[in-house]
Amino acid sequence: MKALKRWFQNSKLAREWPINLSFLGILPFFFAAGGCLLYTSDSGAYLMTARSLSIPLDRSVFYSLYLRGLNDLMSLFTQPILGEIVVLPPLILLFVGIFQLVKKLFPTLQPSNPEKLDYPLTLIQRWIFLSMWLCACFLTSMPWFLLQAMPDIFTAILCIFVLLFLQTKSLRSSIACALVIIISAVMHNANLITLTVVSIAIWLAWKGYLGKWTHPLNKYVSISKTRSLLALSLIPWALLIGSNIWGGNGVTVGKGSHVFFMGKLCENGILKTYLEDECASKPNPFCAFKDSLPEHTWDFVWNSHGILEKTGGWHHSKELYNQIILGTLSKPKYIALHIQAAISATAQQVVLTHGGDGLTPLDTSATLTQELKLHYPDEYQGFINESKQQKSQIDFDFYNRIYDGSALVLLLGAVFCLYRRPNPLLATFFGIAALFILCNAFSTACFANILARLNARDFWILPMLSIGIIVQYFFATASKQQQPI
């Protein structure tokens, strides 16, 4: 609440109506959460890493660096408020990104400057932008991710700025989009995989390797732009590997990545098959547990008294785990199982679109509470006394029923509008957004966990684009009917 008051009192941006519009959509959910941020069980780890500046075993350090950097910057001028640090930069990036998407994807006969970041829009574009922003706020789960002290909102920002990067023609705007893409990608390990897979898929399609049907798409996105995106996708990998080298973890994306991969092998059943085939001739410590493997990745990774601790733990299991992982990737039988498991996991993940996953009451003696108490006393008091998350007073079932119904109606409506009035530009970028969401489902389901939170964090972009397509269709239809015969 203190962050909100200070924003309206002191910020010049707060006196500009477009930025205020962004707050009008978010405020109801801010109050629905009790005027507090939302937290998951991982939020405390990010805050702790931000203070220690250590390289974690199980996640990217860059979201913690983002929190620490903005905290130190704010402390030069005023008392840092966690709500401002967590919410305002992503909110502005989302607002600007969606604003620019309207200008790029919904051109009119009298367009505003397509490259300059200004506010003037034509009347039709204003209605499209207003409908898209309000849809994102009230008909999708976007606000719940924006209010979380988590890096998940940066996955949606990544998707939006990938769309902008592909459509932008000026060098200056391309550089600006590229910087946002890099920053968003390094916030979460899965974002790196998503960006790389999307970039490869788009480049292959535009090169024609997926069929001649892709050739007409070159008029909307140049082949050179797809190559640039592919090259750009390598930079976050270099940054993440560099951070681990700097932290003494060696040349690796994550020192604990082998643990997560082994957890996935437990979950998809490949490890059990491998052990049944190999234990007789090549026994290893896992053979004693082949009939009692955990059903889910998180059970393997986070059970402090589970198989992980009995087979070396985080620090002494890498050699054994990598030997087994490479063993499952060296024979056609296991490779086929990997492909089958990836398809199945992606299919399960991509339909999980509900908000509120992980936003349950948290242990008040855990790391999160200690970090808030030491460094953000106002947020600590709100978390302890006012947070409706802590009181289980946020009815996510109610909101999710709205989101499900809205998504179904809007997606079907967009497909109908594109069928009745074909728009190759919109269809192309709608397809790219859908591809991004599918690739995010693949990367999170196959290398992390099958959780609604990991898919819903960017799925909301499709309903938002859908309402823009529908509004544009009705404006175009009305304009055609008004033309004299």
Give the label of every model feature segment.
Residues 33-47, 54-70, 74-78:
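Extracytoplasmic catalytic/substrate-binding loops of multi-pass membrane glycan-assembly enzymes
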Residues 252-379:
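Membrane-proximal stem/loop segments at transmembrane-domain junctions that anchor or position
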Residues 143-154:
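Short acidic/glycine- and proline-prone juxtamembrane loop motifs at membrane-interface regions
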Residues 12-39, 137-138, 232-245:
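Transmembrane signal-anchor helices characteristic of membrane glycosylation enzymes that use polyprenol
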Residues 154-173, 177, 181, 198-199, ...:
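Specific aromatic-rich, kink-prone transmembrane helix
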Residues 28, 77-88, 341-433, 437:
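Membrane-interface anchor segments at the N-terminal boundary of transmembrane helices
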Residues 1-28, 115-128, 224-225, 229, ...:
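Start-transfer (signal-anchor) and selected internal transmembrane alpha helices
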Residues 175-188, 233-240:
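Membrane-interface alpha helices of multi-pass inner-membrane proteins
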